[in-house]
Amino acid sequence: MIEPHRGFETSEFANRCSKAQQAMTKSDIGALLLTSEADVRYFTGFMTQFWQSPTRPWFVLLPASGKPIAVIPSIGEQLMKSCYIGDLRSWASPAESDDGVTLLTTVIREQIGHSGKLGMMMGRETSIRMPLVDLQTLQNLLENVEFLDMTADVQKIRMIKSPAEQKKLMHVCKIVSDVFTSLPEWTFAGMPLNELFRRFKIKALESGIDDVSYLVGGAGPNGYQDIIAPPNNHPLLNGDVFMLDTGCLWDGYFSDFNRNFAIHHAHDTAKDAHQKLFDATEAALEILKPGITAADLFFVMDRELRPNQSSQNTGDSVGRYGHGMGIQLTEPPSHTDWDQTIIETGMAITLEPSINYGDGLTMVTEENLLIVDDGFVLMSTRASRNLPIIGNL
């Protein structure tokens, strides 16, 4: 397998910034303030695990034209200098008071004046990564500035993956698919669930993954009840059904899919649930092409799984049947009955139907796909219709 080029050409970041600036111009927005890890990385290439420390705020200001301006703690200067920026301002952080707020205010005023328009990410699936009290101080210092939401514009730009992004996504999904394919070779009855998780991470790293930053799942007789839990030391027993759902990273891009298995044998209800989920995914694949909506995907899967219900959005549901993916584990859109986002060429999405069965059991399957002009390309190796059974020789 040929490994894609790490990082991006300068033109990639220039194109991303240009698209955002075109959207800013339409709303007469003088600058866009970015504070989250994903948005800062998307527009500058600033990639570091140092974001796991909540101590320091990091700011990037995208002006109406030109390269982004970084306003960051001095500890990040050297790395940020290697990124796609036109200017860098820094301060010693953490500060006893005024942790970058006055400096940020100055830079914003340089770009939009005292009464311009400042774009921010305010909508669904966003957050402002700075103390609320500092945000309030910033708003008070910029009392004549109009704060406007640019969530829809930025998310639309990020939804469409460039050819370089697509190669990274295809690569990470191929590696993880191969690890899942090998899983029955090193999994056995009696293995504690936490040891299985640990072994999976080791196999993924040995196969070329940069990090296994997300790995959840469950196991139990005939099935599992929880799909987001960390592992326990429960040994896998004959008749257990288990699931691993993983988000693995390669050069900052995620895979996000799961696989189900049974040990030695499985009850017919578990086998039936797995087949229904496969059929629901197949129904979605049959209509998947540019021009449909995320809601269309929801409804076609829901009709397969719950033919007698008008909507999946009940108290015992997970709320959606898949989502976008990329530099974050999950990204817009959401395959729900209300999301009218148009599926477009270049999107990377998951299909993730789920079903309840038996006595409080649940099962979920997930595939990763890339949307192309005439339909889709599977990035994950398609799960089988029949529930894989380990040790039934």
Where are these regions (language model features)?
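Active-site neighborhoods and metal-handling regions in enzymes and metal-associated proteins
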Residues: 1-393
